């Protein structure tokens, strides 16, 4: 794969008003994508966004670029990333575009693409788009210019799709659920899905103003959700991030239920119902408690690099259907082509309803190991992880932790940091081992 100039692992992303998140670059990107994506099909591209104020500016610029290349744009407005993937497929569009920076603050934004089948664009297509970005723009003839339409019922279509993944003979009647939408793209979707399935819903994070997305709310800050669950005596709480591809849950006692626990609940229920295909893909950061719990059920487990795109790659390689990260990206390929927070929450709720068990009860089978995470800064130059003393200590600790913990040492790809992670049944021991490793790295 050629080295990328503009596209990162998740499209183009950055601070609004600074290259490449500017209207002039977005226009050029729309044009370049339009030139590459134009085929003999519908010549239509679906455009969705989250609730950032900059989304208005960027979608207009993208639409102008697409039109100049002869492609029409179909706007769906604020819409979760997985919804855009789904709607791109059902509208038979050439591609889907999402304007979002996921869990980042409002002053960041990004642009990423889905192929016609709702999956990440192939590398060769992204490379072809990049090559055009450095070329002067040309335009189709006036009678070939693209148009723009707005799809007013997109939210309703996705709500019905989500509800259709929930067992037809089940209901959420009797459940009180607090739903935190991070003032993001799920604000008009998730509460309605839960209500229409019968739940009593208490909303927080559902009043976006363009500036408050992910601000002290959502999957990256669940303190408000925990308080709301306890205050309202709810059965559980659900938090999504700004673009709806990540989920964290809270049980009735206010305890956090992370992506590893959610993944286990879904996997166990799929096994019970005979719908589990293959095994489960986690990441290098997945808790050892998840691995052990899956092993007790004889469910195969493998680890991908950190990042939902790497989880997806492993799933496709193994032809498995279920994977995710402890941060809350949960991919259920039987239901959607990308991580989908609403679908994941419905999978957990279906398991609760099937067994008439609380979320707290369902998490008991996957006791998470205490995990210590430390960052150590170093002065460029030699990689401390190649130092003989550091390697010897790491090997010694790994030997001591066999069967009851693990360590993970990795160099940051963006800054001069070594990330140290130690998991152990004994929290005190985990902290001790982590500090020993940090000391060795600092003294290398």
UniProtKB/Swiss-Prot annotation:
Q: Which GO molecular function annotations are given, in alphabetical order?
A: magnesium ion binding; phosphoglucosamine mutase activity; phosphomannomutase activity
Q: Does the keyword Coiled coil apply?
A: no
Q: Which SUPFAM superfamilies match?
A: Phosphoglucomutase, C-terminal domain, Phosphoglucomutase, first 3 domains
What GO terms fall under cellular component here?
Answer: cytosol
Reported cofactor(s): Mg(2+)
In the record, biological process GO terms are: carbohydrate metabolic process; peptidoglycan biosynthetic process; UDP-N-acetylglucosamine biosynthetic process
Role played: Catalyzes the conversion of glucosamine-6-phosphate to glucosamine-1-phosphate.
Q: What is this protein called?
A: Phosphoglucosamine mutase
Organism annotation: Haemophilus ducreyi (strain 35000HP / ATCC 700724)
Q: What gene does this protein come from?
A: glmM
